[in-house]
């Protein structure tokens, strides 16, 4: 079993912790709690760089090693880092899901990359414009953190 953790922080009140677990070469389980969000859906993605020197902006674009368009976590054709939306109620998003495309090892590894929670709902690449195919029109980056191995 390989485990990783990400502590999310931003310039405002949004903060959280997300944990990742992978058994052998199976799907990755993603479990987290993010506080300080407005109620509703917020895009949640893995971005390329583990660089937060300029806040969440320096994390770069979505992790996309196969050079595909943005999509839903259920789409075969999507960025590896496209994890869809997390839903906040009462300012808190608590979630647990599995994802078949991210990994904690190998060429699709998210270790050392940045997890980002966004201001708006991710349209899952169905928005009908160029930005939808890049970012899902998820808006600004509220909080982020570098993903690292943990015991």
From Swiss-Prot:
Which Pfam families does this UniProt record tie to the protein? Sod_Cu
Question: Record-annotated residues binding Cu cation?
Answer: 45, 47, 62, 118
Q: Which domain of life is it from?
A: Eukaryota
InterPro entries reported in the protein's UniProt record: SOD-like_Cu/Zn_dom_sf, SOD_Cu/Zn_/chaperone, SOD_Cu/Zn_BS, SOD_Cu_Zn_dom
Q: Which cofactor does it need?
A: Cu cation; Zn(2+)
Q: What is a biological process (GO) this protein takes part in?
A: removal of superoxide radicals
Enzyme's top EC category: oxidoreductase
Question: What does the entry list under GO cellular component?
Answer: cytosol; mitochondrion; nucleus; peroxisome
What is the protein's quaternary organization? Answer: Homodimer, and heterodimer of Superoxide dismutase [Cu-Zn] A and B.
Protein name, entry field: Superoxide dismutase [Cu-Zn] A
């Amino acid at each position: 079993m390989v485990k990783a953790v990400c502590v999310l922080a931003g310039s405002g009140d949004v903060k959280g912790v997300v944990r990742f677990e992978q058994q052998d070469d199976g799907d990755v389980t993603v479990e987290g709690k993010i506080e300080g969000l407005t109620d509703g859906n917020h895009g949640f993605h893995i971005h390329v760089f583990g660089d937060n020197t300029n806040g969440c902006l320096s994390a770069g674009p979505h992790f996309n090693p196969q050079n595909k368009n943005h999509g839903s976590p259920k789409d075969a054709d999507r960025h590896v880092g496209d994890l869809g939306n997390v839903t906040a109620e009462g300012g808190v998003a608590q979630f647990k899901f599995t994802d078949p495309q991210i990994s904690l090892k190998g060429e699709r590894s998210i270790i050392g990359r940045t997890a980002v929670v966004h201001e708006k709902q991710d349209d899952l690449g169905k928005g009908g414009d160029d930005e939808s195919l890049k970012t899902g029109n998820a808006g600004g980056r509220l909080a982020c953190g570098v993903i690292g191995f943990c015991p």
